[in-house]
Structures are given as C-alpha cells and as structure tokens.
C-alpha cells in the first residue's frame, strides 16, 4: 500500500497516519489486495464549513478509464482543524469506506446516470443517515481507532 499525504500539518505525525492506514486496511483486505492500494490523504482547512463534513473518501479519478474493475486509488479528505484523536477517528471512518469500495460492497456508477449501490442494492436516494455503508463506518470507526492506539504506536 502506498499512502501520500498533502496539506496535513506535521503535528498529526505523517508516519502515524500511514501506520493507521495499514493497520485498518490490513484487518479487511488480503495482503495481495493491500499491496495495490494507493491512498492520497489531503488536508483541508474549513472542510466542515465548506462541505458540511469532517472527511470524505472517494475513488480517485485515476481509476476511471484505467480499465480496472476494482478501484485501488483513493482520495481521503480530512478537516485539519480537528484535534489529534478526532482526526484519527475520522481517518478510520474513511478507511472503512476504502475497504467498502475495494471489496466492491460500495459502488458508484456515473453512466448513463449516477447510481450508488451497497452490496448490489440501489441506495442512491437514501438519506445519508440511513445509508448502510455509513452505518458500518460509524460502527467501526471508534473501535478501530481505539485498537490502533492501544497498540502503543
């Protein structure tokens, strides 16, 4: 797995961010799948004010047109005004979404029109709070974050 970090202050310890990515994704993905994953983590001030969220995970535009059926390139945006612990909790949440995309549980299509599916079921029109992929990410974020920091890293 390759992780690049952009616009994230050093106080968040870039090495620790990379370790967290590996820790979380190694719980869900095989070593073979993990070695192909590329994640760009982009810090953004005021993300909450601009977009109404503390973090986002998306399949990189590099994936589309690559001919690959399973996405392996991801972008995670995180609000850098967060405190240390919350940033890692949000990172864990977004990494659950990476797992969902990489395992093809969560899929988005843009042609002929936008559709979002979860395990084969169309969830395009569901409210954010009723989305099963968000329920899973919220259920796992704190547990993963606590497990990561219990390792004493």
Give residue ranges: language-model regions.
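Zn2+-dependent metallopeptidase catalytic core
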Residues: 13-36
């Amino acid at each position: 797995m390759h992780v690049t970090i952009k616009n994230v202050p050093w106080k968040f310890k870039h090495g620790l961010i990379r370790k967290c990515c590996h820790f979380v994704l190694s719980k869900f993905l095989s070593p073979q799948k993990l070695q192909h994953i590329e994640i760009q983590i982009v810090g953004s001030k005021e993300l909450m004010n601009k977009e109404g969220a503390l973090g986002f995970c998306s399949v990189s535009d590099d994936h589309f047109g690559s001919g690959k059926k399973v996405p392996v390139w991801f972008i995670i945006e995180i609000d850098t005004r967060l405190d240390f612990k919350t940033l890692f909790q949000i990172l864990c949440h977004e990494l659950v979404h990476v797992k969902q995309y990489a395992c093809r549980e969560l899929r988005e299509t843009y042609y002929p029109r936008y559709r979002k599916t979860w395990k084969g079921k169309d969830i395009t029109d569901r409210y954010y709070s009723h989305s099963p992929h968000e329920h899973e990410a919220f259920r796992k974020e704190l547990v993963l974050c606590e497990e990561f920091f219990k390792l004493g890293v």
